[in-house]
Amino acid sequence: MSSDWDTNTVIGQRVRTGGSGPRQQVARTQGQINAARRAGLVLSVDKKYASSNTKANNEGQRLTMVDRETDIVKPKKLDPSVGRAIAKGRGDKGMTQKDLATRINEKPTVINDYEAGRAIPNQQILAKMERALGVKLRGKGIGEPLGGPKKK
């Protein structure tokens, strides 16, 4: 899987000594490489190595894998018990959906989606709701009062 971007062709008979003689240069086009080969000047074709600021992007691999799968995978939805726990906790505190949304810096539609069970669960939003309502929304015991910090 080698491309022109990966190779580095150096043109010149020998490394230049002193102030005279032909300079060593890097060929940028295929035409320059061919001209140098005809003249017998190609010294080496070196592979460029990846620089330090590049990293692999796995998102394309994941999308390809999802594309090739034959069965349809539904995204995870919120359990209805979580929506009921949010509504109950909100009612106990006397808050509207808008009040809760402003308290956790989200839009009221997000709160509505979570209560209706339409939302794809986001751990950060659930954690903010847990703290604002004082009710567990994740793990075991959904709807139970949230315990304070652990004693040492």
From Swiss-Prot:
Where would I find the HTH cro/C1-type domain in this sequence? 86-140
This entry's Gene Ontology molecular function terms read: DNA binding; ribosome binding
Q: Where is the composition biased (Polar residues)?
A: 1-11, 22-32
UniProt name for this protein? Multiprotein-bridging factor 1
Record key words, sorted? Activator, DNA-binding, Transcription, Transcription regulation
Annotated region (Disordered), positions in chain: 1-32
Its annotated function is as follows:
Transcriptional coactivator that stimulates GCN4-dependent transcriptional activity by bridging the DNA-binding region of GCN4 and TBP (SPT15), thereby recruiting TBP to GCN4-bound promoters. Involved in induction of the ribosome quality control (RQC) pathway; a pathway that degrades nascent peptide chains during problematic translation. Required to prevent stalled ribosomes from frameshifting.
Residue ranges of DNA binding: 97-116
User: Which InterPro entries did the record assign?
Assistant: Cro/C1-type_HTH, Lambda_DNA-bd_dom_sf, MBF1_N
Q: Specify whether Transferase is a keyword of the entry.
A: no
Gene3D superfamilies tied to this protein: lambda repressor-like DNA-binding domains
Pull one GO CC term from this UniProt entry: cytoplasm
Q: Tell me its family.
A: Belongs to the MBF1 family.
Q: Which CDD domains match?
A: HTH_XRE
Q: Name one GO biological process term.
A: rescue of stalled ribosome
User: According to the lineage, what is the superkingdom?
Assistant: Eukaryota
